[in-house]
A protein has these predicted regions:
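The catalytic Tyr-centered alpha-helix of NAD(P)H-dependent dehydrogenases
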Residues: 137, 149-156, 186, 190-194, ...
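Short aromatic-enriched loop/helix-cap "lid" or pocket-rim segments at secondary-structure transitions
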Residues: 41-44, 132-135, 188-191, 255-256, ...
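N-terminal Rossmann-like NAD(P)+-binding domain of SDR-like oxidoreductases, especially those catalyzing
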Residues: 1-183, 308, 313-316, 322, ...
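Hydrophobic alpha-helix immediately C-terminal to the catalytic Tyr-X-X-X-Lys motif of short-chain
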Residues: 159, 163, 167, 197, ...
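Residues that form or flank phosphate/diphosphate-binding pockets in enzymes
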Residues: 12, 38-39, 64, 188, ...
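C-terminal substrate-binding subdomain of Rossmann-fold SDR/epimerase-dehydratase oxidoreductases
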Residues: 3, 19, 29, 58, ...
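Short histidine/acidic/glycine/proline-rich micro-motifs that form metal-
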Residues: 35, 182-185, 215-216, 276-277
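A glycine/serine/threonine-rich, flexible loop-to-helix segment
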Residues: 47, 135-136, 190-198, 274
Length: 339
């Protein structure tokens, strides 16, 4: 079995590669990654010498490079993690999101048509559903929830999902899609809420919280997410969408306060900044379908997962300190410096 994992040097993609190489040592895993700001080759250092792993630096929008890889490796399965994924960046510069999230997906679809595969899996997001009101805790996103996007990022992800399903219906490509809630865990790029707060708190820097911090997210430990995708690509029904949620709804401000408590830092570090444009209020996923059909359930409670995550960042400071000392620092100042 040969699997191409696009975006495999990023947060979720790298964790998926670790999971697959450990669980299926006989599989050949190919990582295709452009190595943008969020793709860090040092993340994959532990598997670089594995004879069943190969890294290829290329852009999924580069049709020639993608076709060449398909010709060389004859993959059975494609798992597409490659995407620009930060909402704030999509608001500042939406153009690059169109390129990677839609054009890149189209190139992969065409490669699958041309060379043939047994499964193409698109990793998507619950953000394609829009948001839910804070005063309706009884409401959850299901696979039947209409697409109702709020940001350029979620719009382009939704467009990619629709494209994947169109290729399934038109050309018969064997596809599946998963839509997950907010992930957290090791190797999470420090522009996202949890790693950003951990890094800033450790440096006794301000902890920027949008608005009043009352926005609610459902948190999914990245290892649980990887196990769900593993199940879908092996046992999921072709042409289906599967929601993957963690049953861990938390307000942003409560997460930040919890991180302060775990690190022994004062809540006075919390700084409220101007809210994000079009900030979604609440995300909450109903994962009943994947549980009933594939037997998946999240294993990690947030209280345990956040402790493991903080421990990882404490033990791997060089990984994230190297990141925030470079180009990311310029972006950080742009986003939070004058708020």
């Amino acid at each position: 079995m040969t699997i191409i994992v696009t975006g495999g040097a990023g947060f979720i993609g790298s964790n998926f590669i670790f999971h697959m190489l450990k669980k299926y040592p006989e599989y050949r895993i190919i990582c295709l990654d452009k190595l943008t700001y969020a793709g860090n080759l040092s993340t994959l250092e532990s598997v670089m010498d594995n004879p069943n792993f190969r890294f290829v630096k290329a852009d999924i929008c580069d049709r020639e490079a993608v076709y060449k890889l398909f010709e060389e490796e004859h993959p059975d399965i494609i798992v597409n993690f490659a995407a620009e994924s930060h909402v704030d960046r999509s608001i500042e510069d939406p153009g690059i999101f169109l390129e990677t999230n839609i054009k890149g997906t189209a190139v992969l679809m065409d490669a699958c048509r041309k060379y043939g595969i047994t499964r193409y899996h698109q990793v998507s997001t619950d953000e394609v559903y829009g948001d839910l009101p804070l005063d309706r805790p009884d409401l959850f996103f299901t696979e039947e929830t209409p697409i109702h996007t709020s940001s350029p990022y979620s719009s382009y992800k939704a467009g990619a999902d629709l494209l994947v399903m169109a290729y399934h219906r038109t050309y018969g490509l064997p596809v599946t899609i998963s839509r997950c809630s907010n992930n957290y865990g090791p190797y999470h790029f420090p522009e996202k809420l949890i790693p950003l707060m951990i890094a800033n708190a450790l440096a006794d820097k301000p902890l920027p919280v949008y608005g009043e911090g009352i926005n609610v997210r459902d948190w999914l430990y990245v290892e649980d997410h990887c196990k769900a995708i593993d199940l879908i690509i092996h046992k999921g029904k072709v042409g289906e969408v599967y929601n993957i949620g963690g049953h861990n709804e938390m307000r942003n401000i409560d997460i930040v306060k919890l991180i302060c408590k775990e690190l022994g830092k004062p809540e006075s570090l919390i700084t409220y900044v101007t809210d994000r444009k079009g900030h979604d209020m609440r995300y909450a996923i109903d994962p009943t379908k994947i549980h009933k059909e594939l037997g998946w359930l999240p294993e990690t409670k947030f209280a345990d997962g956040i402790k493991k995550t903080i421990k990882w960042y404490l033990e791997n400071k060089k990984w994230w300190q190297d990141i925030i000392s470079g180009e990311y620092q310029k972006y950080y100042e742009k986003m939070y410096g004058n708020r």
